[in-house]
């Protein structure tokens, strides 16, 4: 009888532990099997938490999540982002990002000038989420993403009062 009780206790303990670390269900990007995404994924071991939110398991290749409930989702393997005049392009920690804030308080940040692209979906709600600056300012996360070589970078946009510089004439 003690063996049966011990086995039941082990099963119960395993169930409790499994309940504490639920897997985040995500879909892999089309290019998730790119070897550069594997390089990023391996280096995400150096990012155990972001803004106080612990990393969680995901069920899709080249993805990651932080927080319970998840406040940061990462997907590697998207097509390289094209230049745009509608999205803000920012640089932080050596990585350029296109920022889509059309679904506030959620932000979608996609690397610019890297192939394949990495995308972050961030709950930026001050009450329940995490600061986007804490996410993209995380040095270990930036170092992981920077393993994908940059081919383009953000350029400064002229302000509304900028005067165009005339091109030289011959």
Which residues fall in each region the model found?
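Bacterial N-terminal signal peptides that target proteins for export
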Residues: 1-8
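Mature extracytoplasmic or organellar-lumen-exposed domains after removal of signal/transit peptides
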Residues: 79-81, 116
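Extracytosolic low-complexity repeat regions of secreted or lipid-anchored proteins
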Residues: 86-170
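Secreted/processed peptides and extracellular or luminal domains of membrane proteins
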Residues: 26, 43-44, 82, 95, ...
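N-terminal secretory signal peptides
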Residues: 25-77
């Amino acid at each position: 009888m003690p063996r049966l009780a011990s086995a039941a206790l082990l099963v119960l303990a395993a169930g409790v532990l499994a309940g504490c670390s639920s897997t985040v269900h995500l879909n892999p990007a089309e290019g998730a099997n790119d070897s550069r995404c594997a390089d990023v994924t391996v280096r995400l071991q150096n990012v155990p938490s972001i803004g106080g939110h612990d990393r969680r398991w995901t069920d899709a290749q080249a993805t990651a999540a932080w927080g319970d409930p998840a406040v940061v989702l990462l997907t590697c393997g998207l097509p390289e982002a094209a230049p745009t005049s509608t999205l803000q392009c920012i640089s932080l920690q050596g990585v350029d990002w296109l920022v889509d804030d059309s679904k506030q308080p959620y932000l979608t940040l996609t690397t610019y000038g890297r192939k394949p692209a990495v995308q972050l979906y961030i709950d930026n709600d001050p009450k329940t989420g995490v600061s986007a600056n804490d996410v993209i300012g995380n040095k270990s996360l930036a170092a992981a993403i920077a393993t994908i070589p940059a081919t383009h970078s953000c350029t400064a946009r002229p302000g509304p009062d900028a005067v165009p510089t005339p091109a030289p004439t011959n």
